Amino acid sequence: MTVKAPNFKLISTSNEVVELNKIKSKLIVLYFYPKDDTPGCTLETKDFNSLISKFSKNNCSVYGISKDSLESHKKFKKKYKIKFDLLSDEKKIAIKAYKVWGKKQFMGKEFMGLIISSFLIKNKKIIKEWRSVRVKNHAQEVLNYILDK
C-alpha cells in the first residue's frame, strides 16, 4: 500500500530551499531525528553517511530532518563530514505532515517529542515507512530494502 508523500519546502545545509516534489532522484529517504549531536541521532546520521555512495548508486537521495536550527545543522554536518543535506524544520511543517511528533517516554516521564522515523519515497508516494526506529543498523536496513526491490 502506498500513500501520497506530503510535500514540503525546507531550508537545507546547502542554503537552498528543498521542495520534496522537485527532487529529481528516483528514490528519496527522509529520516527524522530529534536532535543534532546527541548519541543516537549522531549514530544514525553517521551510518547513513557511511552508506551514502551506495544510496547514490541506486539513484536515492537521503535527507535528515529535525527541528534544530540551520546553524545547528551546519555545525553538525561539518563536525561529522556529512555528505548529504540536513533540513531544518523549526516550525515542524514536515514533522507534523509525516506525523512523527507525538508522546514519548524517558525515565518514567511522558513528553511530546520527535519520534525517530524514516520514509522511502518513489514517484511522490511513500512506499515504505519505519516508525519508532532503533537507530543501530537502521541505515543498512533501509539500504537493504532498496536493494531487495
Regions found by a protein language model. Name each.
Residues 1-149:
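Chalcogenol-based redox active-site neighborhoods
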